[in-house]
Amino acid sequence: GTSKHGGVLALAGDDHAAKSSTLPRQSDHQFSAAMIPVLYPSSVQEILDLGLHGWAMSRYSGLWVGFKCVADTVESSASVSIDPDRVNIVVPDDFPLPPDGVSIRWPDPFLVTEARMQDYKIYAALHYARVNRLNRIVVDSPKPRLGIVTSGKSYLDVRQALDDLGLDER
């Protein structure tokens, strides 16, 4: 766990094509098994923006937050904005947290810690993501019939594929 003045952003270097390792590697399943929410940036700018949100989400929820890093993103360069006002972090004040908070504490027995994680922390992270619009509809229509859900580098790949097919936001 974490504290309101701490926060943990756990970076995982995924290697889907096994370019740098003997086996392909994907962190999503390990993060999920450990009840760690995952942020997956699609660009160098999003590494900065979502990194700030990751620390804030960790502090708010008391959870570690996973950060999926793929070579196409982290081994690239870009011009980015470092304006401190670029990312508007909203710390929710309308979520029913336990009276003693969600932060790690000693000497709580492991069952109490696990119950706090399953009863509050996961939902606090989801609430943080909702309030800060971390998951959003990018292209909408009045009568949607089909949806594509994607994140990170695959978001850029899907947008490129749609563009290659001549499909735009209309």
Per-range role (PLM):
Residues 1-59, 70:
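Thiamine diphosphate
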